[in-house]
Amino acid sequence: FEQYPSNDITEGNFYKTDDDFNQGVVSCYAKLKTMMSFHLTEIGYRSDENILESMAVSTQDRYDIDNFIETASNGILSDIWDAWYNGIYRCNDVLDHMNGVQIPNYNKYRGECLFMRSWWYFNLYRTFGVVPIARTVVPPAAAKLIPRCTEEEMYSLLTEDLAEAARLLPDTRNAEKARVTGIAAYTLLAKVYLT
């Protein structure tokens, strides 16, 4: 018999209802805001999307990104790595808790998490090359021991997850226009094939 404080949300008493899973999925979407408002802008220094006019108005980290000098000490790249893996963790957390559960929006939530996890991995791959892959929640100590994947493993993960997401997600959304659709999953899958 496990007893949890009645006024606290814990891992043991959460993920029981459809609404709980919806909140978990929304936490995955919330992590996208971090990515859109900052990290993609910073990565844009590698292209002609952003121009680094002078070091006087910038930092060494941005200069290094602009010149494809990637070091572990680059604070911006470290922040990007941490934030994107946090997004993956959130998706894996929801997916892990969905095993064996029957909820009305199971397919939709699973599809959304698979899509977002693929989004994070795709952008990690484009930014850093092959990276460690975790398909489930992994304790931090164990996560440090996961080796970088091969390109084949990365493409396998992306194509499998996005194909499943495309099948599970609706093609359009009436009331929830800001949520991903099957068409978005097919679009990202096409981008993966073109990369």
What are these regions (language model features)?
Residues V130, E176-T187:
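Aromatic-lined, polymer-binding surfaces characteristic
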Residues N7-T10, F68-E70, T136-A142:
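Short linear capping/connector segments at secondary-structure termini
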Residues L114, Y186-V192:
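TPR/Sel1-like alpha-solenoid repeat signature
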Residues D18, N22, V26, A30-M36, ...:
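Conserved, well-structured interaction surfaces
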Residues F1-D19, L158, A190:
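Bacterial Sec-dependent N-terminal signal peptides
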Residues S37-I43:
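Beta-strand acidic-aromatic groove motif in beta-rich domains, primarily in extracellular
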Residues D48, L52-A56:
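Core domains of carbohydrate- and sulfate-ester-processing enzymes
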